[in-house]
Amino acid sequence: MRLGVNIDHIATLREARKTTEPDPIKGALIAIEAGADQITLHLREDRRHIQDEDLFRLKCELKDTNIPINLEMAPTYEMQNIALEALPNNVTLVPEKRQEITTEGGLDVVSMIDYLKDFIKPIKQQGITVSLFIDPDYEQIDASVEVGADAIEIHTGEYANAYGKNVEKELERIKKAAKYAKEKGLKVYAGHGLTYQNVSEIAKIKEIEELNIGHSIIANAVFLGLYEAVKKMKEIILNARKE
């Protein structure tokens, strides 16, 4: 199972003072040293953390490595143009609202089938893998296949926020969705709200081949250092996978 480390919140810390540190690109290199298989970053329309320059610097820094860049972005034509210029390995389309603190749910692919078909085509033509960040829902999975996505990233936020019996219920939804998506020929990834405490159960789901995790790793990096925080998360994931 691959671990994509999201560097957004290194940039959040930098933007809190509008300064040059901490540098998210330096963070990406440390994460890779510690075992990250991919670097994920979300270029939001409001540029609240990651800036355009970060994406292009990261691309330059990783050009001679085999570490892929996963660009999370809203399905807007401004973002499409940036993706077609930067040419990351992967693009993950996510919903976006300016007032939200973080992404609040999955992309409603069902309601934008025609739009997404046209939107995705030129991105895929450049050899970029396209993933859709969706809720664990059969209808959304079917729509993802219809629009031509290569992969889905299952939104694990409901699972992460669940308590008591609801934890098992949400986990079951994710398991069923992962199995269904795999049967439909999609690659299956997952992410959002995953922590050192709750990641194991998701990592055990054999259909899921990649997890993208950011906030929990960066939060723990404050106390452990980034290298150790990434290493610890990777160990938990790999150990869960062995079970």
Swiss-Prot record:
The reaction(s) this protein catalyses: 3-amino-2-oxopropyl phosphate + 1-deoxy-D-xylulose 5-phosphate = pyridoxine 5'-phosphate + phosphate + 2 H2O + H(+)
GO molecular function: pyridoxine 5'-phosphate synthase activity
Chain positions recorded as 1-deoxy-D-xylulose 5-phosphate binding sites: 8-9, 44, 49, 102
Cell compartment(s), UniProt: Cytoplasm
Family annotation (Pfam families): PdxJ (PF03740)
Disulfide-bonded cysteines: none
Marked site positions, Transition state stabilizer: 153
EC number(s) stated in the UniProt entry for this protein: 2.6.99.2
SUPFAM superfamilies for this protein: Pyridoxine 5'-phosphate synthase
Broad class of where this protein is predominantly found: cytoplasm
Keywords linked to the UniProt accession: Cytoplasm, Pyridoxine biosynthesis, Transferase
Function recorded in the entry: Catalyzes the complicated ring closure reaction between the two acyclic compounds 1-deoxy-D-xylulose-5-phosphate (DXP) and 3-amino-2-oxopropyl phosphate (1-amino-acetone-3-phosphate or AAP) to form pyridoxine 5'-phosphate (PNP) and inorganic phosphate.
Protein name: Pyridoxine 5'-phosphate synthase
UniProt gene name: pdxJ
